[in-house]
Amino acid sequence: MGNLCVDVITLFPEMFSAITEYGITSRAVKQGLLQVTCWNPRDYTTDRHHTVDDRPFGGGPGMVMKIKPLEDALVSARQATGAAAKVIYLSPQGRKLTQQAVKGLAEQESLILIAGRYEGIDERFIEAHVDEEWSIGDYVLSGGELPAMVLIDAVTRLLPGALGHVDSAEEDSFTDGLLDCPHYTRPEVYADQRVPDVLLSGNHAHIRRWRMKQSLGRTFERRADLLESRSLSGEEKKLLEEYLRERDDS
């Protein structure tokens, strides 16, 4: 896992300034850990209207992105990035993007992301060029740009040196298959609500157990499906039982 080069084929390259100019991803760009290059299919059209879409065969509403501009943009991206780059189409028909999937993508040296628009892109382009399809959820967006940015952000967090603290990525939600524990900062008391005493104790073993217990309890209450695919250790089972007992007694 090292530096990452991401090429994005998109009709709206300006949107990706959110990645290159703000936050952790911007810092990764400045550090040379992340490179983001956009390729606009409109730049590969030959008509005066720069047409990139057409009516779907068989009728129906909406328009479909044409093959040729996409294919020509992909050729340019491949030449710049390297033929080995994995081509990913952000699509509601794709597999759901999980933290485990993000870890796998972070192992790549280069990615080419296809951000579709309208009713989608010509299926023949997908069959000929796309290696993987990924979805960020079971809902409809106006295009693939936001999912592409989500993927870039998630992968960037796993690049060595991208985060301010070496342990930050390891402690994120989903990293070990669980939701994150609650976090607190100063002041110790706000509107009669106190920070849990254990976090002020300085006892790192107790703090670790408390955080694990809260993480397990939160996951059980909010995303029990995550626990179904995870084998709990003896300590984790005991902590979850403690959490549920304390919850029921309160």
Swiss-Prot record:
The keyword S-adenosyl-L-methionine applies. Keywords: Cytoplasm, Methyltransferase, S-adenosyl-L-methionine, Transferase, tRNA processing. It comes from the Bacteria. S-adenosyl-L-methionine binds at G116, I136, G137, D138, Y139, V140, L141. Gene3D superfamilies: 3.40.1280.10, tRNA(m1g37)methyltransferase, domain 2 (1.10.1270.20). HAMAP family: TrmD. This is tRNA (guanine-N(1)-)-methyltransferase. It comes from Pseudomonas putida (strain GB-1). The gene is trmD.
